[in-house]
Swiss-Prot record:
Signal peptide: 1-18
GO biological-process terms attached to the record: lipoprotein localization to outer membrane; lipoprotein transport
Main localization category: periplasm
Protein name (record): Outer-membrane lipoprotein carrier protein
Function text: Participates in the translocation of lipoproteins from the inner membrane to the outer membrane. Only forms a complex with a lipoprotein if the residue after the N-terminal Cys is not an aspartate (The Asp acts as a targeting signal to indicate that the lipoprotein should stay in the inner membrane).
């Protein structure tokens, strides 16, 4: 009888975590708009910190986001729902690409879409509040994508792990569920900058 009681938590746990893909999607769907500040660390395969940075991010699902890096180098990533704009003031260049083509370069796009068709391309594993996504396509150049999402839908941190083991870690602070204004997801290239338009 004691054995049955000991086994019960294992059965319940198995049921709760039966489908990590659905659990991730369900949690993300609880918060369809948020803003936060972030801290970034790029860590080498050997564990050395290569780069540290800070910035802020604003998201409104589906497909709208503004990712503003303040340090070490100022740059801006904006999605207006169709086009992904990347602006680097230092080199005075803007790159434009279709958002649907940007997942390989910017895995964070997955969180802004929360699309079942996206998740189907990954093996999703769950450990508590942390989800690890590994591409099913063995020819993909993308490594693992690790994200921590609370049961309330709050995205707390995420990491992009390259195939060589280098890791980019992002930790969110001052998480707010306030719905952002629509105009912050628009972008017009400043006059005088070079435009690399990859949408053709």
């Amino acid at each position: 009888m004691i054995g049955l009681f000991l086994a019960a938590p294992l059965v319940l746990s198995s049921a709760v975590w039966a489908n990590p893909q659905q659990e991730l999607s369900s949690r993300l769907s609880l918060v369809n708009a948020f803003s936060a500040n972030f801290d970034q660390k790029v860590v080498s395969p050997e564990g050395d910190v290569l780069v540290e940075g800070k910035g802020d991010v604003t998201i409104k699902r589906p497909n709208l986001f503004r990712w503003n890096t303040v340090t070490p180098d100022e740059n801006l990533l904006v999605s207006d729902g169709k086009t992904l704009w990347y602006y680097s003031p230092f080199i005075e260049q803007v790159t434009a690409m279709w958002l649907k083509d940007a997942t390989e370069q910017t895995p964070f796009v997955l969180l802004t879409r929360n699309s079942a068709s996206d998740w189907d391309n990954y093996n999703v594993a769950q450990t508590s509040d942390t989800f690890t996504l590994t591409p099913k396509d063995t020819t993909s150049t993308m490594g693992k994508f690790v994200v921590t999402v609370a049961k309330t839908g709050e995205v707390r941190n995420f990491s992009v792990v390259e195939q060589d083991g280098q890791r980019s870690n992002f930790k969110f602070r001052q998480f707010s569920k306030q719905v952002p204004k629509a105009n912050i997801f628009t972008f017009t290239p400043p006059k005088g900058v070079e435009l690399d338009d990859q949408r053709n």
